């Protein structure tokens, strides 16, 4: 249920209290790391083998991995993978100034919620006008378009999961309607929402760099 309501970066399942449908989750959501939690009792052996076969990212041993599990999972989330796919975006977008880079990081941090220039400016404690002017300096895209880019890249990543529909992604990312996501996908990548599924985050960035970096249309 949570996967259908909000942006989820990783899932930990206590396999002793899950029904058989839990084993289907890695196949339905391959871009979201899934971890099985177990006390490693002898009777859990068959179930653990089933988890590995189903595609779970890892097995966490209750009482043994507790101290390091949070840090270990945090380094291997869907968000980390999305950021890695866009790691060279600042260079490709000509974002070199400290304010530009801080704004880019804030845009990525807010990628799961509707974001306007004013939200980013408030987080960085500058005026909206100053941020808009400085962000687009040196040939960089305008900030509104970059916000569209980051959110469309996130939508593309989510749509890479067979368990998500376009309407489901619209709900999770807070788009007003499927047509609003379609408009963003068209502006950023010249693609339909369904085509985002094939592009992935990196493909969206590549399309964006082909002449779609300036003002909204």
Regions found by a protein language model. Name each.
Residues 1-10, 17-18:
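Acidic, metal-coordinating helix/loop segments flanking the phosphotransfer/catalytic sites
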Residues 117-146, 170-192:
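Basic/polar phosphate-binding segments, predominantly the helix-turn-helix DNA-binding elements
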Residues 41-58:
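Alpha4 helix (beta4-alpha4-beta5 surface) of REC/receiver domains from two-component response regulators
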Residues 89-114, 123, 145-164:
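A short, Lys/Arg-enriched amphipathic alpha-helix from helix-turn-helix/homeodomain DNA-binding modules
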Residues 73-89:
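The C-terminal output helix
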Residues 11, 31-45:
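A short, hydrophobic beta-strand element within the central beta-sheet of small alpha/beta folds
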Residues 46, 63-73, 130:
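C-terminal output helix
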Residues 183-217:
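…primarily DNA-binding HTH/wHTH and HhH modules…
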